[in-house]
Regions:
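Histidine-centered active-site/metal-ligand motif
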Residues: 45, 146, 171
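Active-site-proximal helices and loops of the catalytic beta/alpha 8
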Residues: 1-2, 53-152, 156-158
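Substrate-binding/active-site clefts of carbohydrate-active enzymes
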Residues: 1-37, 52-69
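Short acidic catalytic loops
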Residues: 34-48
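Gly/Ser/Thr/Ala-enriched C-terminal appendages of enzymes
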Residues: 147, 159-162, 167-169
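Residue-level detector of conserved catalytic or cofactor/ligand-binding positions
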Residues: 168-176
Length: 177
């Protein structure tokens, strides 16, 4: 999932200007259907609503793309018109290069972001994913995502010392294997 050469998924890019012409009707219909099925919807790659990276179809890898502006608040407003009481969680993991405007859009919508425990543990005591560094209670904490190793595999690879340390950070005192 993570590569020095960037990512080239081969997926088509949304034609945001065309979607805006009809008030993001496709997105509204999709979110309305999800709202009928689920109490909570997670929007993956939320940062792309603000700014996204476009890789040319003929490029060998993801290094030769360019940044484009996403629809931002116009899209989130359109979604909010149709979801009713359904809650939205946004995947806002920024890595080493946060996209300006993402936190601002989250604040406008009130939609919580996420933290990933597997990203928390290491030598950096200021790591934003460490539970004692959470500065906002409007968030959801996951052990990992589809981009991570399974939690079983993650813990299996830890030494007893590392496991005890990790569990102490989340207030679990007795490791079991």
């Amino acid at each position: 999932a993570f590569s020095e050469n960037g990512q080239k998924w081969g997926s088509p890019v949304y034609n945001w200007s065309r979607m805006e012409e009809d008030g993001f009707a496709w997105w509204q219909a999709r979110m309305l259907e999800h709202a009928k099925l689920f109490d909570v919807i997670r929007l993956d790659h939320f940062a792309a609503i603000v700014k996204y990276y476009v890789v040319p179809n003929k490029a060998e890898d993801g290094r030769s793309g360019k940044w484009s502006r996403g629809p931002g608040k116009k899209l989130t407003d359109a979604i909010e018109k149709v979801i009713g009481d359904t809650h939205i969680i946004v995947e806002d993991i920024a890595g080493k290069s946060p996209i300006p405007g993402v936190k601002k859009l989250m604040a406008r919508t009130g939609w919580p972001g996420i933290k990933i425990l597997m990203f928390a543990f290491g030598d950096d005591t200021a790591n934003e994913h460490l539970p004692h560094n959470y500065t906002d209670c409007n968030l959801v904490v996951y052990a990992g995502t589809h981009d991570n190793e399974t939690i079983v595999g993650y813990f299996r690879d830890k030494t007893d010392y590392e496991l005890a340390y990790l569990l102490s950070l989340i207030h679990i005192s007795e490791p079991t294997r």
